[in-house]
Amino acid sequence: MSAVTFEDSGTPLKKSKNRHGETSEEMLRRMCRDIAKDITDAKQQDYIDQPRKEITASEWMEGVYDIRYIVDREKRYYRAELMVAGGGPTIWVNLNSKEVEGYWGSDRVTVPFTDNLGLDEYCEEMYGC
């Protein structure tokens, strides 16, 4: 029988891999990188066998599960956080820090992006409606 290795927090070290040979942290990192790349490049790939195509902020927002608006004390728009995955990994696009933030169990990943889609402006406009 093999010995169990533990993280600093005392939880067992996760070494199990998915069918692609990735650990949950590696899979979370890949997912966050892909989302950051889509926002930075203003392109998205619908299916693996198709090329990436240019998209608008409105098209990209169709895949958002939830929006948390950050407002000042007078309820004026400041920034937003967009939930793009949940249930297994939870992934938020933070328009304040300009980072894709992924959480899955004890794993946490952040990947920076440049908002070339204009998501912040889109959210500000939607908040004002």
Predicted regions and their residues:
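Acidic, low-complexity, intrinsically disordered interaction modules
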Residues: 74-109
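Polybasic, proline/glycine-rich intrinsically disordered low-complexity segments
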Residues: 98-129
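Detector for Asparagine
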Residues: 18, 94-96, 116
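Generic alpha-helix signal with a bias toward terminal, lower-confidence helices
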Residues: 40, 47, 51, 94-96, ...
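Negatively charged, low-complexity tracts enriched in Asp/Glu with abundant Ser/Thr
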Residues: 2-84
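Compositionally biased, intrinsically disordered low-complexity regions
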Residues: 12, 23, 65, 90, ...
